[in-house]
């Protein structure tokens, strides 16, 4: 998904995947595209225009330090794009089972932007239907059916607009490194 999109707009892409299994899968998948896949931090001495954390930092205990270290590799005026699960009160056994340490709110990103002197370019919740489904499943202890998301995501985009992106099961943040 995202890699295909970014291949159209940039010539150099590097991926980081600390999981040994997923790392080797990504290396095989992107070998012919000449996309480099690293196990840990950005290790090359190159400045990036954009760094993406797509459903990553919720797995990292010291996520602020992780971001701080990688901001050194971001060009001035570059973008840090972070996608995370939203609202700690929605934390479920599913989150725990997949290794999520927390869920985030806009306040987390306001604090992050102040701490690292970043401009917030976009900060909004999305997947409002997912928000209500998780909330209902928590309140009624209903088992989750993952297949239902495939049908509801397009509908959720309509509801996100109706709710002005004030609620959602996920949060996207685009931060700009000051020039």
Residue ranges and their predicted role:
Residues 13, 120-121:
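Hydrophobic anchor at the start of a short beta-strand
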Residues 115-118, 177:
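A structural motif corresponding to the C-terminal end of an alpha-helix
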Residues 26, 92-96, 132-137:
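Short aromatic-enriched loop/helix-cap "lid" or pocket-rim segments at secondary-structure transitions
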